[in-house]
């Protein structure tokens, strides 16, 4: 009882410190007046009748065991004469009453007032709900029974935008910290269900959800990490510029934006929740998936689930794998990185999508993220709540391009250089070096990738971007049969990571550079992506063509690939990264899969990924052979310059709290993994989320980019 009183006292002290005590009672009074008027004139809904009855009934029970039902009006007035219990229950029931105070169900003056203070109301609701849930079910005792769907409380009407770890609490679960015995010094977390059953670990949570056939709570909504707090208090700063959801409702959870430093807004870009074109549009359906499962118990048994076996089988072939069997997720959390990728259950699988523990990335982000302005690194991303280790954060999305197109559109010479661009780069070097870092690094004069390594290695000249405002992340693979390695980000000049296995080799090449807008207002010319077929060219950067491409893929689920060959000098065979313009940021991921060959032809095969009107009539004629050729030996860029998701704003850190994991969702074709970010440790609320770009300092002597991550083990330089 003392603990409850302490919680209530803390609740009101916090409101008093914020000067919101008067505000909350004004809101309660408005709610009561609204309910009173509607009951008197008969315009109240059933929900409002019930809310009013519960409010008065519970307020009366505080001082008397006699319910308001059957009591006379005189008794009610007598029992309600003490104002303190009534107001206490009013604030406890405020969270139930507020939803009915919409513009449709309340007085006009109340509606206007609530709209202007909406953020404060929602914040207060969260605090009140947490206190009320704890108070209402703390004395619940467990009685032996077989759990079923009747043990669960009804799901709240709207859970979107909530802390995912708060959802069980809103469904009348209790999260408790306790010692396992009197001699133990460590605290452990346990959950108490609405029916009184104790859940001591995630395995018991899964069994309970399986028994109750729950379809609105999942194992990743529960955390048994004692460091994770469900409602962490942090000082709030004044927002200069903000946005409730930069995804405009595309994501399952709103992605907010907040600038507490200046009035600068996010650069214009098209929000894409996943990669476009979709992988299933670029893959022959007959070879899209190599296996599928029909599990009935959540896909946790590797002896029964074909998808878990596929992940384990590929992981075993990796020279980096351990002797321990790797199955991927453990109850929807990733315990360690799997170089060969995770194969999630697909649309061909017959398992229950809600109970399946091997479906994570395909459900989209669940944690609350916020894009914000950092002090030194430009835009960044932070979490608004505590996140447990192994939690999925987001993917890196964008537009999938054919590198051949980007090279052509930029007019790169055979040596991969642009003399005018190089002059701009070095003339701006000193001026821009101080102002930029991590997510906003100025021009990067380096060879963005190396050539595919053959038995006889030759060096390629570096290629410079003609746009000093971009971030390019690039990954290249030389094919190992049945192996897909993680996209290791390494400096490409001569530091390529090469893995030998079964007489074949795989190399990873990636690089990136980011720049803020120049102080002189320099803006590079905007490049256009061209669709070509049989000599015809169309500008695909226009909104009309963009919309056409989107509609085409949705309606036909088929994409045509145009192929042509172009003779190039031997030196241009070096696969060099091309870059695209961006007002603030450029990120791309390039993947190449090739088999090393003796006496390789000097012809460079170029294929166009995108469709235009002229290709529409040819889509039905696309054969499986042409798709196979498209996947073989081609280079793709995942470009987030103008289109992408929240992942495009993630910064670098030498000690990151995110790891990068390839995940196969829409196809098992190793050309098209989703690049997903998971937490590699517990992350506290309001902490910036970062990943290691993987550069090695000193690889480009002409350019130095200093790191601003500020960790103890900082490498001081990104390049």
UniProtKB/Swiss-Prot annotation:
Residues 291-364 form the Pre-SET domain. Zn(2+) 1 binds at residues 293, 295, 299, 305. Belongs to the class V-like SAM-binding methyltransferase superfamily. GO terms for biological process: cell division; chromosome segregation; heart looping; heterochromatin organization; left/right axis specification; methylation; mitotic cell cycle; negative regulation of DNA-templated transcription. Gene3D superfamilies: Methyl-cpg-binding Protein 2, Chain A, SET domain. Disulfide bonds: none annotated. S-adenosyl-L-methionine binds at residues 377-379, 418, 648, 651-652. Residues 367-694 form the SET domain. Residues 157-229 form the MBD domain. Keywords: Cell cycle, Cell division, Chromatin regulator, Chromosome, Developmental protein, Metal-binding, Methyltransferase, Mitosis, Nucleus, S-adenosyl-L-methionine, Transferase, Zinc. Ubiquitous. Highest expression in heart, testis and ovary. The gene is SETDB2. Histone methyltransferase involved in left-right axis specification in early development and mitosis. Specifically trimethylates 'Lys-9' of histone H3 (H3K9me3). H3K9me3 is a specific tag for epigenetic transcriptional repression that recruits HP1 (CBX1, CBX3 and/or CBX5) proteins to methylated histones. Contributes to H3K9me3 in both the interspersed repetitive elements and centromere-associated repeats. Plays a role in chromosome condensation and segregation during mitosis. Zn(2+) 4 binds at residues 654, 707, 709, 714. This is Histone-lysine N-methyltransferase SETDB2. Zn(2+) 2 binds at residues 293, 307, 345, 349. InterPro entries: DNA-bd_dom_sf, Methyl_CpG_DNA-bd, Pre-SET_dom, SET_dom, SET_dom_sf, SETDB1/2-like_MBD, SETDB_methyltransferase.
